[in-house]
Amino acid sequence: MSTLGHQYDNSLVSNAFGFLRLPMNFQPYDSDADWVITGVPFDMATSGRAGGRHGPAAIRQVSTNLAWEHNRFPWNFDMRERLNVVDCGDLVYAFGDAREMSEKLQAHAEKLLAAGKRMLSFGGDHFVTLPLLRAHAKHFGKMALVHFDAHTDTYANGCEFDHGTMFYTAPKEGLIDPNHSVQIGIRTEFDKDNGFTVLDACQVNDRSVDDVIAQVKQIVGDMPVYLTFDIDCLDPAFAPGTGTPVIGGLTSDRAIKLVRGLKDLNIVGMDVVEVAPAYDQSEITALAAATLALEMLYIQAAKKGE
């Protein structure tokens, strides 16, 4: 099958059909799309349970359950009538070649951004965010990061391709400004001197959504924002299908409300990562990821409609 970049794809885990039953467009660069969905079936950088390469396919598959609702509750409008979204399928790269994946993903993102598109990406493990940040920083300059996760991913002792080091590397490369960045839902050890504002899961669960959002807006300001959501930010009761689950996380309800609260930020890129469907129950993790991705698109559509 000829796919993104006119490459033959013999993968068993990618390029089946589009998110929300959207038509596939394997040549999105010259399209009239506002937002382009790209899957990145990569999990070579994971430190825990593998299987994130199946994440994009799982998110798309379960998204058929969301496609029927036109005036989505509680938005009361159809995102597809305000926002032109296309799904360009999955990145094709040589199996086992992490460097090629990283370089191809960055090049793909740079080409889309240069054509005036915005990106919503599906991982894959969280390492895929780093080449996406590199591409976005070239286009938008230094950004703020709004990061939902159980882990800060700011660890300094990892290797070149490691899903726990991206946000140690990104500030060093000048891609993001930690002083204007927020990490939400953290509940594992981290270096308190890394510059990020960390809103741990205990705080986020105990405070009101409005209070948390007000703090996020104050920290981020008017900077361009990259929004990344690692599904293990959710408690394993709501997202068991992930590589490194941690008890004590957010409910899916709270996460959705927090994402909705980000509507007024200048979000220039988004991703949802770390869905590993082999460990899922009744597709609830994939459904949570697909729903969060849809809410991300809705906040863009709501802003466009103002």
Curated annotation (Swiss-Prot):
The keyword Metal-binding applies. Its cofactor is Mn(2+). Keywords: Hydrolase, Manganese, Metal-binding, Polyamine biosynthesis, Putrescine biosynthesis, Spermidine biosynthesis. GO terms for biological process: putrescine biosynthetic process from arginine, via agmatine; spermidine biosynthetic process. Its EC number is 3.5.3.11. GO terms for molecular function: agmatinase activity; identical protein binding; manganese ion binding. It comes from the Bacteria. Mn(2+) 1 binds at H126, D149, D153, D230. InterPro entries: Agmatinase, Agmatinase-rel, Ureohydrolase, Ureohydrolase_dom_sf, Ureohydrolase_Mn_BS. The record marks H163 as: Important for catalytic activity. It catalyses: agmatine + H2O = urea + putrescine. One of its GO terms (cellular component) is cytosol. The expression of auh activity is antagonistically regulated by cyclic AMP and agmatine. In the presence of the cAMP receptor protein, cAMP represses the expression of AUH, while agmatine induces it. Pathway: Amine and polyamine biosynthesis; putrescine biosynthesis via agmatine pathway; putrescine from agmatine: step 1/1. Catalyzes the formation of putrescine from agmatine. Belongs to the arginase family. Agmatinase subfamily. HAMAP family: SpeB. This is Agmatinase. It comes from Escherichia coli (strain K12). The gene is speB.
